[in-house]
Each structure stands twice: as C-alpha cells, then as structure tokens.
Amino acid sequence: QCDWSSDVCSSDLQKAADDLAKELAQYLWDQRDRLRPKVMEIDEAVRRVKAVLADPARKPLLFADCADNPGGGGRGNTIHVLKAFLENGIDRTAYGIFNDPQLAAEAHRLGIGSRFTAQLNRDETNKLSGKLTAPAQVMGLSDGEFVGRRGTMGGRKGSLGQTAWLRLDGRIDVVFITNRQQCLDTEMIEHIGIKVRDMRCVVVKSRGHFRAGFNDIFADEQILEVDSPGLTTPVLQRLPWTNLRHPIWPLEENMTWQVPAEVAVR
C-alpha cells in the first residue's frame, strides 16, 4: 500500500466524523503538489559547483546526496555524484562519507602517501551502487573513532571503523569508511585531517540530519539536495515498482481522484 488516510474518532457523532474525514481527505489531495521533493539533477549540481569554483566571491556549497542516505536504508556507496564531479574536473571538494570497507582496508595496507588505482565498490553486487576506478593517493588513515561537534552527534562518540582519506584524481578528497552510516557531523570528515571550511564544495551522504552538524558553516541557501539513482531517492518515479495498484499519484501525474461517497467505519 502507498496511501494517505484520514481517520476521525468520535464516540457518537458518526455523520460529523464522516464529514470531517472527507474534508481532511480532500484537503490532503488538494495539497499534493506542495509535497513534491525539491531536488536537483546531477548536471545542475555540476553547473553550480563550477560557478562557485570560478568565482571566489561566491559562497561554498554543500550537496546532500539524498538518494543514498544510509539513515534511510541506502548503502552509502553510490558513485553517481562522485563520478560526475570527477568527469567534469571539479576540485576543492570533500566527499563524505563513502562506505567501502575493502577500499579502506587496502589504503591502510598501503600506507599514507601511497599512490594506487582505487577501485570503488569492488565487491559490491547492488546495481544502484555502481563501480568506479580512479587514481588515488592516501592522504590520511584513522581507526574511525571521533567525538561529534554539534547537532545529533554533539559531544557523542562515534565509530566509522577503519577509515581512509583518499584524494581521487588529485582533486576530490573522499572519506572511505567501514561501518556504514550517514554523515551527521563535520567530525566524520575532519577527524582524519580534512578541513571542511577550506573546501569550496562538500558532498554528504545524508538527507536531513546533517544540517544540524553543518549549519554553522553552511547557511540554508548554501545547502542543496541532489538526486541520483539510489534506494532512498525522494523521486518515487525512479524506483522499479512491482505489485503496485494503479493509478496512483505521483507515478500517474494526471490521475484524478474524488472523495468517496461512503467512508469506512471501524
């Protein structure tokens, strides 16, 4: 099921309860366009970053890779935004946190300063995650232990597991972790040596909880949600639905609906 419902409880005023339930249902339907997610395509995100990189007077940007939010069940390792940034020459960017235990372990074996060809998601089988290969340098290593700075992690200990900071293609700094979780706090990136305030762009794998951890650096107008293929995309049309009754909004944009004459009584 994928429905709204309006439920009204009454001890003895059945008609009043029925009428109010219908009124609420109609209100919900009339407000449906307000609930459309406001996310941008990857191409637009690339354009915005290029503008920031070209003009020092522009404020830095923070992108939420909300379609791959581990807090909502995402795998924390889709490559789509990262790949687009690499292909378009984006630099001065921090990307965190990317769940790839195998790559983090490889970086620890090689050691700080080592250069190698990083194979992202080498053992991943989920098609949404994707694979990516890029030249990399090991910039930092840690055991992933940190103390949050503010927001939901403020003053709390966290553990990312074996963690590695890799500079991909000499331009983008990515934090690879072992314990999958969403990026909630700047310390998840900074504990290993990256300085968020020095970056012109930051990308986090989170949907909303990150805001309280980054809002002293990025104002609301500097925070943008970007959409891509992923398990937690808010754009429902992207998902491969099965066994879903039709028509249903928003998959059928032009569908019509009317409040039923009769309402269920329980």
Where are the language model's segments positioned?
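Active-site histidine-anchored catalytic micro-motif
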Residues: 60-82, 86-102
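A generic structural motif
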Residues: 35-42, 92-102, 119-123, 202, ...
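Extended hydrophobic packing segments that form well-structured cores
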Residues: 29, 146-266
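Metallocofactor- and cofactor-centric catalytic cores in central/energy metabolism, strongly enriched
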Residues: 9-14, 25-61, 71
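Short, glycine-/Ser/Thr-/acidic-enriched flexible segments
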Residues: 11-14, 67-70, 100-103, 171, ...
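Acidic, Ser/Thr-rich peripheral helices and adjacent loops at domain boundaries
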Residues: 99-148, 222-230
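Single conserved hydrophobic/aromatic residue that forms the stacking wall/gate
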Residues: 1-8
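Short glycine/threonine-rich loop-to-helix capping motif typified by GTGT followed
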Residues: 49-54, 70-82, 107-112
